Amino acid sequence: VNYVILATPPGFRPVHLAYAMAKGKNVFMEKPVAVDGPGIRSVLASYQVAEDKGLCVAAGTQRRHQKPYIETVARLQEGAIGDVMYIKAYWNGGAIWHRGDKGATPMEVQMRNWYHYTWICGDHIVEQHVHNLDVGNWIMGAHPVRAYGQGGRQGLGPDVSGEKWDHFAVEYEYPNGVHMFSQCRQMAHCEGRVAEAVVGSKGYSNCQDWIRFNEGRPFRYRGEK
């Protein structure tokens, strides 16, 4: 075995990664890499083991591997739209699956419906919206230092077991004072939007494949996808 793919529910990711590092295996692991503080600290320790052993560890933050994003973000980092004023991030989609509770022990219920339990999933922001938030961090070359948010559980009725919320809105602040405005939702019969956008002093971009300037011709990515 040369490498392993870690794609189980993310609550198990840190212990699986630590075992793979102990066995000297290269790893591709899906996002998120962990769902809580202890898990993150374990992953950071495993990263150091990978460095010491010369192993490769790749994570499934997919936009960093998509050529249109790579080209567009590189231009944004070079100052194509001037100073970044604010960023927007969205993952608004339909309702998430639930496999029911009948005929199962409490632990079986949580395993079958892992997306609905925070200890194993991390909830929507951590498990899925991380893709969009990662684009903001990528552009800024930094992580937020503050967050102000709210959310709730509206579409998931009392007959749906679990702890997850189905909608969130969070405002993140980066060290230089730039804000990222975030929305994510998993509710049926609502408008969907999965996207990012950045507004600067000289233009704006969808972060993915185009940049529009206050003056001059826009940029459009036309290379390989």
Positions of predicted regions on the chain:
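N-terminal glycine-rich "phosphate-gripper" loop used for MgATP/nucleotide binding
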Residues: T8-G11
